Structure formats: structure tokens, C-alpha cells
Amino acid sequence: MQSTTNYLWHTDDLLGQGATASVYKARNKKSGEVVAVKVFNSASYRRPPEVQVREFEVLRRLNHQNIVKLFAVEETGGSRQKVLIMEYCSSGSLLSVLEDPENTFGLSEEEFLVVLRCVVAGMNHLRENGIVHRDIKPGNIMRLVGEEGQSIYKLSDFGAARKLDDDEKFVSVYGTEEYLHPDMYERAVLRKPQQKAFGVTVDLWSIGVTLYHAATGSLPFIPFGGPRRNKEIMYRITTEKPAGAISGTQKQENGPLEWSYSLPITCRLSMGLQNQLVPILANILEVEEDKCWGFDQFFAETSDILQRTVIHVFSLPQAVLHHVYIHAHNTIAIFLEAVYEQTNVTPKHQEYLFEGHPCVLEPSLSAQHIAHTAASSPLTLFSMSSDTPKGLAFRDPALDVPKFVPKVDLQADYSTAKGVLGAGYQALWLARVLLDGQALMLRGLHWVLEVLQDTCQQTLEVTRTALLYLSSSLGTERFSSGAGMPDVQERKEATELRTRLQTLSEILSKCSHNVTETQRSLSCLGEELLKNRDQIHEDNKSIQKIQCCLDKMHFIYKQFKKSRMRPGLSYNEEQIHKLDKVNFSHLAKRLLQVFQEECVQTYQVSLVTHGKRMRQVQRAQNHLHLIGHSVATCNSEARGAQESLNKIFDQLLLDRASEQGAEVSPQPMAPHPGPDPKDLVFHMQELCNDMKLLAFDLQDNNRLIERLHRVPSAPDV
């Protein structure tokens, strides 16, 4: 045990060890509060006195939630060594998070944004106090879990930190080589003499490497054999990197350098976030000082990301979930353009559903009027694009599975097991994403069908109403016989109008029949969707199988992790170790088999089926559009015919009225008795009123039809 005036600790409770100090978990003697104590070793005291006290001075200047707090500086009882009493972060570091096999291919989007927010806030506080850290890396970013279960990351280890204004330089070299700025790497690692001085932007390079590591699970610059074994090539990669590139690798000994301008396909960040992040990485991983961003621009661009809100959009034509990052004060027009950039669906062809209801987005309004979305509850984008659904693009985890060496090698076996387990967790993540994608496909199509069924029903009601009035009009006795129309021209016009109305009635009857057929077809498709939605619950068993394999593999992995530090195993322990390797390999094979044969194949079949259904829905929507146009045209023509009939009847009524008021000479005997004039006038007035009502109803129908069928036809391809 060791102690200071107020704290004590056991040397077995080691949290971390560096070149100049060790960190232990300690307790307050009075309260029992857990803290971290940093105890400096003899190497630390060989440094100049001003360097020894620098870390105390730096920490005393800082007070921020994203920087590890300094509680006190005390001395040990016997040797009177200086001890820093600091905040204890119980959940390890960002490095330990990234070392977890679950994060082999990088953090989830939610956790990455937490890291970005915390690191940016902590670095901003350093800059406000004129401090340069000089050793930013995942191992120096500590993690604790807040009361609500959220991660909080804090910058730590200020042994290399010092006060430095923006226009000042320093010449001493600190840092960890994989995260070092190339100029510092050249002098510190390659030991090449140079007279360069370094500024505050060296921290930006380290931040860039750290963020890339957090996003992908791997370092951005990797020579053949690794950074520690091939230092000259490591330096070449960082200094010869083309503008805009964010990573470089050498896959063969003495092979060419390969550059990438985007994050790898295994990265779990959405394309929406990647599009925002990649330009930042490209501009801070820049070796030339005049081309590299300064802190002001870095803070501005990262803050811009963190201030954005994410809107989840599931594109039915593509069968892909998109994350659209925009500011709440942006207009919806900007949101629609952002969707276009990711989906290639132009704003005028974008139609949205949210939770089963049509969602009309007014371009002039602000984006804060858009409903709150989540990955499980996105806006559903529906357009008449005829493209084949592409679905989620991913790399088969089986391609990243390393193989065990035949002999027993505890360190190599541990590393291999870790790699295999990482691929297994990637398969589990992908299986969940693929299953969620299938559910969103089925749910989105179900909602579209409901909207189309409503359109069918309303179109039928409008069409049948128009048919009812036309039938009533055509069945009028006076109109049918043409009685009271002595004028041949008037009789001819009325007959032609009657014929036209009969034709319109036949067209509307055909439209009604077509809508009914479409309705029946959509109902059949809806029944298929319900069956498939029930099947989704069955597919969830595949994920349970993968999880079961992973649980067993993780248990063996923990045994390997424990054994790797041992010098060797007894005979019996070695036999058990060999059996564990065999079982681990069998479990991995079973896991990947379930993923490929059940998850991936089911997803691919779902994509093909989804494409066929989308084309069927597209045909139905186009058909309804044409029917709606026909009904609207028929209503318009019927209105015109009724207006013409009204004019004929109005004129007839005027003529009859004038005949009744005039003195008329006796008429010769007609071969057949004519209708009573009073009776005729009464019927004409009645018919005229009916026709006017019909005209008004047809106008209302037309307006309703126009509202129902404002559906764009398929865009030109």
C-alpha cells in the first residue's frame, strides 16, 4: 500500500503506465471516494524542473467537463514524490472501447458523435486557455458513463502539454508515433535532424488520426507490416498523401501505396454523416502547414455538424435508409435538395409518408416543421422511379476472418480470436440492419397501398355519383322523347347531346370497373405483405442464432485474453486450449453460415420481390392517374353538355311563355293530341333545375378528382 495525507492505494490497482508515471486507482481516506492518482517515476525527475511542474500548472488552469479534473497535488509519505489526485474515469479510455471486438470496424454513429462532441469541446477549452496538448490519441481520452447511461469522454494526460499561443512555436518532441504529425514523426521516430519548429496545429493531425480510428476501428496510414515495423514507409505515406486523401495503405512488401478518399465500406457511419466528416479529415490530415486548416475553421466545421439535426428517410425505390443532416433553421427546400443528393430523386418527384399518413412538405417552411424521426420510424420516401432497388451495400464479414496458426501460440491465438470475434459482431450488426431494412420495405409498401386504396375508394365514389346523375338525366321522359321541341335543329342538337352523355356514361362505367380491378389487385398485394411481415418475426431467430454463437465465442476469447500474458501452459491446459480453438472455429463457421444462408439470402430475395412489387404499385398508380384524368375529362365534357342543354331548355321555356301570352289563331286539327302547355312548362322547369344541379355536382366532382389525382407520372429515364 502507498498513501498521501488524504489518499491511499494498492500498487496492484494499476490503471495505466507511461514513460514517466504510473496511474493507480485510489480512495479518499475519509469519504472512500474513488480517484485516480498519478505517481511519477525516477525518469520523470530527470526532466528539467520547469517541465516537471508543467503538468500541475496546466491542469490548474483547466476546468471543463470534457477534461479530467485535478483535485489536488500531494506527496507520498516516505519518498515525498509528487502525486496528482485526479478524477477517476471508471469506463476505461476510447482506446479500450475501440479494442473491444464489438467495435473492430468502428463506433456506432451515435457513439461517434458523442466522441466528436466531447473531443471538440475539450480541445476548444484548451485553445481558449492557450494550451497545446501534443499527445492526443484514443488512450488519452478517458470515458465514464453518466447517470442516464450516456458516455462522457474527457481529455487526459497533460504530461506533454504546455502553454502556447497561436503564433508561437515549440521545438521539443512529444507524442505517440501513430498519431504524430509527420514533421514531428521525422524527428522523433526517424531521428532525422531538422530545425523545424511546431505550432498548435500539430494537435489537429492527431485529432484527425484519432477520429478516423474511432470511425473505422483502424489507423488511416498503415505500411506493410504495420506502423511500428516499417517506419520509413509510414513516413512516406503521411508525407506523400495526395490532397483530399484521408488514408493510405501498403498491402504488399515494397508494393505501391494505395490512397482512399472515403471511409471504408465496413464503416458503420451513415453516408449522410460521412459526407460531412470526410472533408474535415481531408483538411486536418494535411502535412503542408499552409494548406492545413487552422483551429478556427476546424471548430467551425465540426460545430456545424454537431448543431445539425438528423432526419431519417427510408427510400422505398432504393430500399435504403438515409440520414439527412440539416440545420433546424434550414428551409424544407434545402432538406429536399439534401435528399436528392443522397437518393437522386428530384424534389418535384419526392412524396413522403410518415407513420402511414401522407406528409406534405411545404418547401418554404423551416425544417423544424418536419416530424421527429428515428431509424425505426423514418420518413418514407415514395417516388415513381423505375430503378431496381439496390439495398444496403456491405462487405461480407467472412472476407475479414483471420485463421489460427496450427501450433499453440498464446499471443497469436488471442489476436486471431479477437479478429474472428470482430467479424462475428460485424455480421450480427449487419444481420440486424438487413432485417430492419426488410421491415421498412414491407411497412412502407403497406402504407403506400393504403393510400392508393383510399384513392381508389374516393375515385369510385366520385365516378359512381357522376354515373347516377347521368343515368337520372338520360332517363328523363321529356328529354328522351324530345317532346315539346318542334324545331328540327333543336331536336337534333338535343339528340347529339344525349348521345354524347350516353358515351360519357359508358366511359365512366368502364373507369369504375377498372378502378375496382385495381382495388382488387392492390388488396391481393396487401395480403402478401401481411404474410411477409409475419415472416419477419421468424427471421429474427437467425439473429438469435448468431448471438448465441457470439456468446460462446466471447467466453473462449476471454480465456485466450487471460492466457496470453502467461509464459506457457501445462500439458492439460494446452489440450484444453487446442479444443477451445477448434470449438471457436466451428462456432465462427456456423455463425457465418447462418448469416450468409439465412440473413443475406433472405434479404436478397426480399429485394427482388420488393422490386417487383414496386413496379406493380407503379403500374397501379399510373393507371389510377390515367383513370383520374379520364374521369376529370368526362366530368368537364358532361358539364359542357349540360350547359348546352340548359340553354336549349331555357330558350324553350321562353318560347312557351311568349306563346301563352299572345293571341293565337286557331290551329288546325293535329293527327295526334299534343301535350298540355302548362304540363310541359312544369316539366321543362323541373328538368332544367335537375340539369343545373347536375352541373354543379359535376363541377364539385371535377375539383375532387383533381385533388385525388395530382399524382405525377413516372419521370423520364
Curated annotation (Swiss-Prot):
In the record, what terms sit under GO molecular function? Answer: ATP binding; identical protein binding; IkappaB kinase activity; K48-linked polyubiquitin modification-dependent protein binding; protein kinase activity; ubiquitin protein ligase binding
Which keywords has UniProt assigned to this entry? ATP-binding, Cytoplasm, DNA damage, Isopeptide bond, Kinase, Nucleotide-binding, Nucleus, Phosphoprotein, Serine/threonine-protein kinase, Transferase, Ubl conjugation
Q: According to the UniProt record, list the residues that bear Phosphoserine.
A: 172, 665
First-level EC class:
transferase
- The domain of life is Eukaryota
Summarize the activity regulation. Answer: Kinase activity is inhibited competitively by amlexanox.
Q: What is its EC number?
A: 2.7.11.10
Map out region (Interaction with DDX3X) in residue numbers.
385-650
Crosslinked positions for Glycyl lysine isopeptide (Lys-Gly) (interchain with G-Cter in ubiquitin)?
30, 403
**Descriptive protein name:** Inhibitor of nuclear factor kappa-B kinase subunit epsilon
Species this chain originates from: Mus musculus (Mouse)
